[in-house]
């Protein structure tokens, strides 16, 4: 569930590539795009899911406590890292501004209520920006309905409300990104019956014994992303500028 981040306008990857920045001995004068790439290679992206004190977290293997999260922030600050926003990353990508040598972007996937309850107060207190990416289909049920979460159903109140999302977006600290409308699940990926990520897999049709075409795949993904963008606007949020792919690597 590690994620790579993309700009929705240009679909440009923003990934943690610092370890691979090795200058050539015979390097020539760099063109602007090379310099922009060097900027993004200095960016570290830390991906979180749940930050909660609840022992019954939705995804225990990916959850950390508030104490652990604060210790991460303390360590990063002590070691000279500077927290940056999506705005700053996009400005660096466009060549308008430079990122600090030890820039770090905090990302949070899925849209759990614990983000508002636990993470947001910490970000506000420390004035740290972050990217929060939500799965639209998980937020559509009403408070009386259940959310289909993997192979189980969970209470709607375990996910963020639209009012909470609006408040956090207005704070200027939290960028609300897309984590797809409904691609955070598996689909049939081959004749052997293996389930693979819906966002990156060509769907296999048992009845015709054929795979989804590249065109059909692209249209399916586009429909999903457009639907999530429309859902944002419907609930008073700005259209997302960042896309975090479910199960991306």
Where do the PLM segments sit?
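Bacterial N-terminal signal peptides that target proteins for export
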Residues: 1-10
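Bacterial N-terminal signal peptides
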Residues: 9-19
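N-terminal pre-catalytic segment of deacetylase/amide-hydrolase enzymes
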Residues: 23-104
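Metal-dependent polysaccharide deacetylase catalytic core of the NodB/CE4 family, i.e.
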Residues: 46-52, 102-104, 124-249
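Aromatic- and glycine-enriched glycan-recognition loops and surfaces
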Residues: 62-77, 111-113, 155-164
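Short beta->alpha connector loops
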Residues: 88-89, 110-113, 246-249
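Membrane-embedded segments
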Residues: 101-103, 107, 114-119
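Active-site metal-binding loops of divalent metal-dependent hydrolases
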Residues: 108-111, 180
């Amino acid at each position: 569930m590690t994620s790579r981040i993309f700009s929705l306008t240009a679909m440009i990857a923003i990934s943690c590539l610092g370890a691979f920045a090795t200058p050539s001995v015979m390097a020539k004068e760099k063109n602007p795009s090379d310099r922009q790439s060097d900027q993004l290679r200095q960016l570290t992206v830390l991906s979180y899911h749940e930050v909660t004190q609840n022992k019954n977290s939705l995804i225990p293997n990916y959850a950390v406590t508030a104490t652990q999260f604060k210790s991460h922030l303390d360590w990063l600050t002590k070691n000279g890292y500077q927290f940056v926003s999506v705005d700053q990353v996009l400005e660096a990508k466009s060549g308008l501004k430079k990122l600090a040598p030890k820039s770090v972007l905090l990302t949070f996937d899925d849209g759990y209520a614990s983000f508002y309850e636990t993470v947001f107060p910490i970000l506000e207190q420390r004035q740290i920006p972050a990217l929060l990416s939500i799965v639209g289909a998980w937020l559509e049920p009403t408070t009386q309905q259940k959310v289909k979460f993997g192979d189980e159903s969970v209470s709607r109140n375990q996910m963020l409300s639209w009012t909470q999302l609006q408040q956090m977006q207005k704070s200027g600290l939290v960028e609300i990104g897309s984590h797809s409308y409904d691609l955070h699940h598996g689909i049939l990926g081959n004749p052997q019956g293996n389930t693979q990520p819906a966002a990156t897999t060509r769907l296999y049709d048992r009845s015709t014994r054929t795979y989804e075409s590249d065109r059909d795949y692209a249209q399916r993904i586009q429909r999903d992303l457009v639907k999530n963008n429309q859902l944002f606007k419907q609930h008073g949020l700005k259209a997302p500028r960042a896309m975090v792919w479910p199960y991306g690597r």
